[in-house]
Regions:
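Short amphipathic alpha-helix with an adjacent loop that forms part of the alpha/beta core around
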Residues: 44-48, 130-133
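Short, internal strand/loop/helix patches
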Residues: 36, 98, 105-146
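Conserved redox-active cysteine motifs that mediate thiol-disulfide chemistry
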Residues: 57-74
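Short active-site neighborhood of thiol/selenol oxidoreductases, capturing the structured segment around
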Residues: 45-62
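Bacterial Sec-dependent N-terminal signal peptides
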Residues: 1-25
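N-terminal "domain-start" segment that seeds a small globular fold
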Residues: 20-46
Length: 147
């Protein structure tokens, strides 16, 4: 099971890195993201400092995103409390490119996305986070270390 999860995540990251112009260099600090969570609270990416974090750009209407969600749930369950050289634990910071709050919330519940860091400005492709990270397609994932 562990090998399947690692293999799948490797495929996801490889394809997405090849298909996009990432707006930062590997090893450089990432730009802060602060967006509203599903409970209307502000959540910052920097709140997760010290952990390995998967920044996940997705949307409820995106079929490939929804097909990818079960694998992210498996990875989260397996790695959430693990110790890593480059981080203490694993978290997912999900950034939705939805415009419809109800559809976004329903997708989180239906897909059983158990992590707590779900954020969106409900601006779709006009999202500041998507622009900052030069996201041109979804699903898009960026893995960052503890720093």
């Amino acid at each position: 099971m562990k090998k399947k999860i690692l293999f799948f995540l490797n495929i996801i990251f490889s394809i997405q890195l090849l298909s996009q112009n990432i707006s930062f260099n590997i090893g450089s600090p990432v730009t802060e993201i602060e967006l509203t969570g599903i409970n209307k609270e502000k959540i910052k990416l920097s709140d997760l400092r010290g952990k390995l974090v998967l920044i996940d750009f997705w949307a409820s209407w995106c079929k490939p995103c929804r097909r990818e969600n079960p694998n992210k749930v498996l990875a989260y369950k397996y790695y959430n409390n693990k110790e890593f050289v480059n981080g203490n634990g694993f978290e997912i910071f999900s950034i939705s490119l939805d415009k419809n709050s109800k559809a976004w919330n329903e997708a989180i519940k239906k897909d059983n996305l158990l992590w707590k860091n779900h954020v969106s400005d409900l601006k779709g492709w006009e999202s500041e986070a998507a622009k900052t990270y030069n996201i041109k397609s979804i699903p898009s994932n960026i893995l960052i270390d503890k720093n």
